[in-house]
């Protein structure tokens, strides 16, 4: 029988309740646990308060309560070069990126994993809601966790088999309320701390104001699909496909329906808008995606697979047929039913029942083979 005390698990602790409970559970299971706080961003807020300092204080309190050593590591340079510059470049292209997917791939499961290995770790863990299963060949499969509402496999969709083999998910079989209860029963300092929301480097700040500090905005016309000017936009990067709020457009003689963003024309710097939730221009029948990553490894041959997918977080699965092209590591995905507001830059993640297969980045969307003018 394996003695857990000889297995070192380095836990990425954010100062939140989920990673705190992960560390606690691993300690209770007898592992040699080390806590590490990652500082990925200089996150002084508009009032001059650095939330990372507060979070690290919480990590220290919890580590002392559990009885584990702790460290702090600064990944700001890695984060800027591998996540934030990617984020800005995607917005420059008129796309809507998902920095959390890239942060997991490049920082939490690469930079942090490397650092943990330098601490002689056998495994790493964090506070993610996800699960794994090892097959008879030793291949690790990514599985949905017990708490479907907190399922974070979408954000982990770019991890490799090598990364997955080094990860433990202590919260796999717990719901969020159960995690809170464990923290309260153990008297952890973070037991009642509210969850962080939004993109980590923006925090509670105004997104438009934040983005304008790094990218110059270029205002332009808001037009209908047939070219009628109906308003002015503040800069294409501030809008995403399917967006309703913040357009500043009222009802017309023809309709009282709200307006939605249905496309962008980068060459003309025009934002294309149309009235009605069910605008035909919002519905795609297929898409192209690139940078495909499968948890069990990249196939050497083309694959056609009937499965389900999500193209945004917490969205119900939709039926798809995936056509994988091994030569250029891309997929063409056909939807069983037209899909609303497919957004270039976002992740599409594939599932087969309870297993998460992997994901890719959406490049283009089509309606009956005609490319939608989403970017």
Swiss-Prot record:
Family annotation (SUPFAM superfamilies): Adenine nucleotide alpha hydrolases-like
Enzyme nomenclature, EC number: 2.8.1.13
GO molecular function: ATP binding; tRNA binding; tRNA-uridine 2-sulfurtransferase activity
Binding-site list for ATP: 12-19, 38, 127
One CC-aspect GO term: cytoplasm
GO biological process, one term: tRNA wobble position uridine thiolation
Stretches the record annotates as Interaction with target base in tRNA: 98-100
Swiss-Prot/TrEMBL keywords: ATP-binding, Cytoplasm, Disulfide bond, Nucleotide-binding, RNA-binding, Transferase, tRNA processing, tRNA-binding
Disulfide bonds: 103-200
UniProt superkingdom: Bacteria
Region (Interaction with tRNA): 150-152, 312-313
Keyword Transferase recorded: yes
Catalytic activity: S-sulfanyl-L-cysteinyl-[protein] + uridine(34) in tRNA + AH2 + ATP = 2-thiouridine(34) in tRNA + L-cysteinyl-[protein] + A + AMP + diphosphate + H(+)
Top class in the EC scheme: transferase
CDD domains hit by this protein: MnmA_TRMU-like
Task of the protein: Catalyzes the 2-thiolation of uridine at the wobble position (U34) of tRNA, leading to the formation of s(2)U34.
Family affiliation: Belongs to the MnmA/TRMU family.
Listed name of the protein: tRNA-specific 2-thiouridylase MnmA
């Amino acid at each position: 029988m394996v003695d857990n005390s000889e297995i070192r698990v380095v836990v990425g602790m954010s100062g939140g309740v989920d990673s705190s409970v992960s560390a606690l559970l691993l300690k209770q299971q007898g592992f040699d646990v080390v806590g590490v706080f990652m500082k990925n961003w200089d996150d002084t807020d508009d009032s001059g308060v650095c939330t990372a300092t507060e979070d690290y204080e919480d990590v220290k309190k919890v580590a002392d309560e559990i009885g584990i050593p702790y460290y702090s590591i600064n990944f700001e340079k890695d984060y800027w070069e591998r996540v934030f510059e990617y984020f800005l470049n995607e917005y420059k292209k008129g796309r809507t990126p998902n920095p959390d997917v890239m942060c997991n791939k490049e920082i939490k499961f690469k930079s942090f994993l490397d650092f943990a290995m330098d601490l002689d770790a056998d495994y790493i863990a964090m506070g993610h809601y996800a699960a794994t299963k090892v097959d008879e060949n030793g291949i690790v499969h990514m599985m949905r966790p017990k708490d479907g509402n907190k399922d974070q496999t979408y954000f982990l969709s770019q991890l490799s088999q090598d990364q997955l083999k080094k990860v433990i998910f202590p919260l796999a079989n717990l719901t969020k309320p159960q995690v809170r209860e464990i923290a309260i029963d153990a008297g952890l300092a973070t037991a009642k701390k509210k969850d962080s929301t939004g993109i980590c480097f923006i925090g509670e700040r105004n997104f438009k104001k934040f983005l304008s500090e790094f990218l110059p905005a270029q205002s332009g016309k808001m037009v209908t699909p047939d070219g009628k000017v109906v308003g002015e936009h503040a800069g294409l990067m501030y809008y995403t496909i399917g967006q309703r709020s913040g357009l500043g457009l009222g009802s017309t003689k023809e309709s009282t329906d709200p307006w939605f963003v249905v496309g962008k024309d980068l060459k003309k710097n025009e934002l294309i808008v149309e009235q009605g939730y069910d605008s035909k221009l919002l519905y795609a029948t297929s898409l192209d995606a690139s940078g495909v990553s499968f948890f069990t490894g990249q196939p050497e041959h083309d694959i056609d697979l009937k499965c389900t997918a999500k193209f945004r977080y917490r969205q119900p699965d939709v039926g798809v047929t995936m056509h994988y092209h091994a030569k250029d590591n891309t997929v063409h995905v056909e939807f069983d039913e037209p899909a609303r507001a497919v957004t270039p830059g976002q992740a599409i993640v594939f599932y087969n029942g309870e297993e998460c297969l992997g994901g890719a980045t959406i490049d283009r969307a089509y309606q009956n083979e005609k490319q939608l003018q989403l970017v």
